[in-house]
Amino acid sequence: MERITTNFRSSSTAAEVIEGVDLSGKHAIVTGGASGIGFKTTKALCAAGAAVTLAVRRPAAARAVAENIRVSTGNAAVEVRSLDVSDLASVRRFCADWTGPLQILINNAGIMALQDLHRTLEGWEMQFATNFLGHFALTTGLHAALVAA
C-alpha cells in the first residue's frame, strides 16, 4: 500500500491548501462560516470561485462578514442562511428549504465542552448535539443534493 503524503502542515492556511483549484460553478455550505476556521474556509472557497452559503446561528451578524468576503474576494455569490445545528428542527427546515445540487458541505460549526450540563429542546447534551448529531442530520438531510451534484 502506498502512503499518501502532503506538503501541507498544521501551519498551512486554507488559502494555501486551495491555491490553484477552480471551484467556479460549484456550491458549498459552510456551517459556522462567519467566524474562526469557518470564516477562513469560506473566504478561501469564495476566492476559488465557489458560491458559498454561510449556515449560521446569528444571520444578522454574519451578513457583515459575508459582505467583507464579497469585497475581499470579488465573489458576489455569498449568502447567509439561518441554521442552528444543535436544533434538529432548524436542521430539518434548512434541508427542506435547500434547492439545487450541492458539491461541497463543510461541517465546521462546533462548541467546546461546557462547564455545566446543557441540553437541547430535544433533550440531547449540547456538545453532542452541536458537534455530532446536528451535522449528521444535516449531511443525511442534504444527501440527495450532494448526490445530484
Short names for language-model regions:
Residues A48-A64:
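Conserved glycine-rich Rossmann-like NAD(P)H-binding loop of the short-chain dehydrogenase/reductase
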Residues L114-A129:
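Short alpha-helical oligomerization interface
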Residues P59, V80-R93:
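The beta1-alpha1 cofactor-binding region of Rossmann-like NAD(H)/NADP(H)-dependent oxidoreductases
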Residues H27, A34-S35:
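Conserved glycine-rich cofactor-binding loop
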Residues M1-I29, A96:
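Non-catalytic terminal and boundary segments that flank Rossmann-like NAD(P)-dependent oxidoreductase
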Residues G38-F39:
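N-terminal Rossmann-fold NAD(P) dinucleotide-binding loop
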